[in-house]
């Protein structure tokens, strides 16, 4: 189905509607699964030697020193323009402001007299950040991951990226205070972070996007007892735009294309109650597409994308919630009025002047978001992902005495005798003291 085909939602059957909201299938082929498993085992067994071999094989690069020196990072910084450095500084400031505001206040309550319960927060001790390389290095992801890691207080932050690492990535690491940077990419980088090697430290949790091999490696290490936790399941990038007749077609088209250019498996959807708007957006997409360097990539993504006309904005919201987009852009006359009805979205952008690019780079929200329908249960990345919560309880003699019979009754009902005895022994000890 061509992206220029405008679909009337209410003329479709329930099955056709379901098909319209289906995402392009993603699944690791058996060969990818096997290849990744072999890479993980090899890196775990052979450490740095395996990493160097994979760099030569996949990156066509000879890596002598896996760790990037402070001198190399400083030199990279000198090669960047002041304009780019200033832009990064503004982005970091906004990201820092928003994520600092996410700090949870401690919880300290007395649930009943003499029974004190607390919730305290601790940082994840060590985290690994994977930053893809290639022709368009995602240095903005360094800012999005390293900034909350620093605010959370993670003691060790390790960054891996395929060699040769772009100057922008090295400077972003320096700007965010990341000192441990390694010339390692692909599934082998995930293996190094999960298991550790002679050079690369093992970490507790791994963050960051990547290709099918990286995604599969993250999945596999998260399921191994000796592996590492991961940030969230990953899928292709996606955006859904809700627009009414008051929207600017060129703005809508630019937002759709900003996601389509990510990759051929990206998906973009327009929902509008205005058929004229759908036609105008389709025309604007074609005009803008002709000017894009990544036009072919975007055009492939548009093959799995949709222009859908609904009966009203309420139906747009209903359909959006069914789909649960990674990015939701609302370009309507009263965009904020729709927010309360939104139940599933990674990040929401309101009004004509809130392009998705703002969240990708510099507004302050995080651009690491759940995709592929995971918005139903997963949240956008935030400070909490670099922290863990711990509960504390303390009972005084009086508090324990008042609660003892309740605990004994519940434990007995579950036939957990040792649980009951742990209370009864203390009750008897108090009686002897009396």
Curated annotation (Swiss-Prot):
Binding-site list for NAD(+): 130, 188, 211
MF-aspect GO terms: histidinol dehydrogenase activity; NAD binding; zinc ion binding
Enzyme nomenclature, EC number: 1.1.1.23
Active site positions: 326-327
GO CC, one annotated term: cytosol
InterPro entries reported for this sequence: Ald_DH/histidinol_DH (IPR016161), Histidinol_DH_CS (IPR001692), Histidinol_DH_monofunct (IPR022695), Hstdl_DH (IPR012131)
Tagged with keyword NAD: yes
Binding annotation for Zn(2+): 259, 262, 360, 419
Pathway as given in its UniProt record: Amino-acid biosynthesis; L-histidine biosynthesis; L-histidine from 5-phospho-alpha-D-ribose 1-diphosphate: step 9/9
Cofactor: Zn(2+)
Swiss-Prot/TrEMBL keywords: Amino-acid biosynthesis, Histidine biosynthesis, Metal-binding, NAD, Oxidoreductase, Zinc
Short name of one Pfam family: Histidinol_dh
Keyword Zinc: yes
Reactions catalysed, as given in the entry: L-histidinol + 2 NAD(+) + H2O = L-histidine + 2 NADH + 3 H(+)
Cofactor binding, note field: Binds 1 zinc ion per subunit.
GO biological process: L-histidine biosynthetic process
Job of this protein: Catalyzes the sequential NAD-dependent oxidations of L-histidinol to L-histidinaldehyde and then to L-histidine.
The family this protein is said to belong to: Belongs to the histidinol dehydrogenase family.
Assembly description: Homodimer.
The protein's name: Histidinol dehydrogenase
Gene name per UniProt: hisD
């Amino acid at each position: 189905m061509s992206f220029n085909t405008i679909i009337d939602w209410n003329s479709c059957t329930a099955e056709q509607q379901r098909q319209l909201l289906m995402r392009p299938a993603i699944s690791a082929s058996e060969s990818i699964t096997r290849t990744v498993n072999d890479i993980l085992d090899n890196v775990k067994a052979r450490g740095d030697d395996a990493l160097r071999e994979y760099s030569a094989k996949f990156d066509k690069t000879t890596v002598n020193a896996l760790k990037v020196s402070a001198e190399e990072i400083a030199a990279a910084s000198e090669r960047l323009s002041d304009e780019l450095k200033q832009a990064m500084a503004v982005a970091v400031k906004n990201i820092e402001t928003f994520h600092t505001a996410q700090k949870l206040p401690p919880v300290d309550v007395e649930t009943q007299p003499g029974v004190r319960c607390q919730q305290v927060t601790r940082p994840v001790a060590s985290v690994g950040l994977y930053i893809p390389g290639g022709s368009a290095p995602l240095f903005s992801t360094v800012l999005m991951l390293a900034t909350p890691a620093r605010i959370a207080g993670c003691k060790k932050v390790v960054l891996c990226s395929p060699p040769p690492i772009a100057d922008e990535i090295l400077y972003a690491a320096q700007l965010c205070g990341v000192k441990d940077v390694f010339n390692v990419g692909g599934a082998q980088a995930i293996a190094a972070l999960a298991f550790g090697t002679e050079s690369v430290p093992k970490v507790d949790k791994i963050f960051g996007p990547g290709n099918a091999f990286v995604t599969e490696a993250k999945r596999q290490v998260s399921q191994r007892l000796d592996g590492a936790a991961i940030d969230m399941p990953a899928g292709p990038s996606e955006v859904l735009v809700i627009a009414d007749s008051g929207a600017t077609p060129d703005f809508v088209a630019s937002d759709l294309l900003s996601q389509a250019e990510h990759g051929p498996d990206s998906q973009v959807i327009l929902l509008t109650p205005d058929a004229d708007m759908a036609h105008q957006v389709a025309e604007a997409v074609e005009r803008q597409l002709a000017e894009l360097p990544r036009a072919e990539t975007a055009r492939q993504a548009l093959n799995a994308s949709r222009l859908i006309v609904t009966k009203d904005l309420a139906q747009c919201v209903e359909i959006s919630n069914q789909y649960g987009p990674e990015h939701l852009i609302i370009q309507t006359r009263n965009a904020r009025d729709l927010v309360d009805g939104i139940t599933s979205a990674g990040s929401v952008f309101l009004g004509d002047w809130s392009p998705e690019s703002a969240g990708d780079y510099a507004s302050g929200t995080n651009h690491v978001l759940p995709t592929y329908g995971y918005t139903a249960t997963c949240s956008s990345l935030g400070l909490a992902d670099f922290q863990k919560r711990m509960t504390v309880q303390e009972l005084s003699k009086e508090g324990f005495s008042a609660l003892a019979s309740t605990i004994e009754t519940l434990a007995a009902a579950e036939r957990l005798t040792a649980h009951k005895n742990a209370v009864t022994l203390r009750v008897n000890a108090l009686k002897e003291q009396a």
